[in-house]
Amino acid sequence: MVAPIPAKRGRKPAVATAPATGQVQSLTRGLKLLEWIAESNGSVALTELAQQAGLPNSTTHRLLTTMQQQGFVRQVGELGHWAIGAHAFMVGSSFLQSRNLLAIVHPILRNLMEESGETVNMAVLDQSDHEAIIIDQVQCTHLMRMSAPIGGKLPMHASGAGKAFLAQLSEEQVTKLLHRKGLHAYTHATLVSPVHLKEDLAQTRKRGYSFDDEEHALGLRCLAACIFDEHREPFAAISISGPISRITDDRVTEFGAMVIKAAKEVTLAYGGMR
């Protein structure tokens, strides 16, 4: 993993090289804030960013919350420091091009595929759209196997990775998300009742893994567990997917234990904490 560049303390406020007005000025300021967060040791306080930018705290906060709404930055930890968001992957591939996470994860995904005999995926959380995005995959060798495109999106309420993420939210956050996004029915098994979904999420927290039982596609089952960063925040999930003929009722617990173990390995290797 590439060592993060420590934040430079006491940096003089930035001085614009050319005059800028309106939205262009706001865009320039926002991009500079994004760069400084990326150069930090993981997260930066609002006051430090404001000092670096030579802006009032209120203006800096407004720029950050705008980028947060689009998923480019996120708040982490009890102090609410600012860190890079996963949506950077969608527009600039910075999340993927660094190769740090994938270099750590891919061997673990391959081992999990060999152990389980099923296709294994890794997805990250896109906080702006509240969807899970597949960024890596190791397909099994069976003729009948699950296949999803890299960059493909998974619904939060009807996928293993999505429900693993949802289970880490508070009930208030889940309620707010469901009110905004709704519960689309993909199959007859999709959980379209908020009450039933919340009951399922409670079971996910208790087990340590989520279980998509033909809720996104008929005949397909998926189990997933979250990966956590250094702030104990979930940012990715590992999943095992396969047909119901192979992921049978008597093997669900076995597959669940496998995916929990793999997720813990990645969390530890990535320097995260649970």
UniProtKB/Swiss-Prot annotation:
Its quaternary organisation is: Homotetramer and homodimer. Homotetramer in its active, DNA-bound form. Homodimer in its inactive form.
The record places domain IclR-ED at 101-272
TM segment ranges: none
Which positions make up the DNA-binding region?
A: 46-65
Output the superkingdom of the source species.
Bacteria
- Iron: present as a keyword of the record? no
Q: Which GO terms describe its biological process?
A: glyoxylate cycle; negative regulation of DNA-templated transcription; regulation of DNA-templated transcription
Q: What does this protein do?
A: Regulation of the glyoxylate bypass operon (aceBAK), which encodes isocitrate lyase, malate synthase as well as isocitrate dehydrogenase kinase/phosphorylase. Glyoxylate disrupts the interaction with the promoter by favoring the inactive dimeric form. Pyruvate enhances promoter binding by stabilizing the tetrameric form.
Q: Which UniProt keywords apply?
A: DNA-binding, Glyoxylate bypass, Repressor, Transcription, Transcription regulation
Further information in the entry reads: Glyoxylate and pyruvate occupy the same site.
Q: Which PROSITE patterns match?
A: HTH_ICLR, ICLR_ED
Q: Which residues form the HTH iclR-type domain?
A: 24-86
- GO CC terms for this protein? cytosol
Record: residues binding glyoxylate: G160, A161, D212, C222, S239, I240, S241
The molecular function terms in GO held by this entry are: DNA binding; DNA-binding transcription factor activity
Name of this chain's protein? Transcriptional repressor IclR
